[in-house]
Amino acid sequence: MRRPVLLLSIALLIPACNGGTVDQHALKNDSDAIDSLACEGALLAHQVVDGATTEPFTRVHAGELATRASNFQDALSQRPTTPGIESAVRTEAEKAGRVADLLHQLEANDADSAAELKGRLKQEGDCA
């Protein structure tokens, strides 16, 4: 009896995981999350430049951030949208892809390129 209830619970939760139709509110939330990933990546790049982080930490953390950005890219590229915002949603998907690419580059932990990546991530995320 517990197994069918568990399966039903999982089936009900799956659509809530970055699924469904993208409306203006969801687009704003996803956009803010993508900006946050870019800004967090910029902070990590700053630590690399300053020598304030280790290579394993940078590799793992940048990889996790890149995966999350890639997930937004995939979801926003495929999900249906409410009328009138499809272009904005697809543009945000492209931005998420750019952020993911930059974060993958940061995984290499190259201090020379980290300074450039920091600037590009700050620009993508419109970081303060």
Regions from the PLM with identified roles:
Residues M1-L7:
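Bacterial N-terminal signal peptides that target proteins for export
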Residues L13-A16:
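C-terminal motif of bacterial Sec signal peptides marking the signal peptidase cleavage site
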Residues N18-H25:
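Bacterial lipoprotein signal-peptidase II cleavage site
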Residues A26-H104, A111, A115-C127:
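Alpha-helical segments in soluble extracytoplasmic regions
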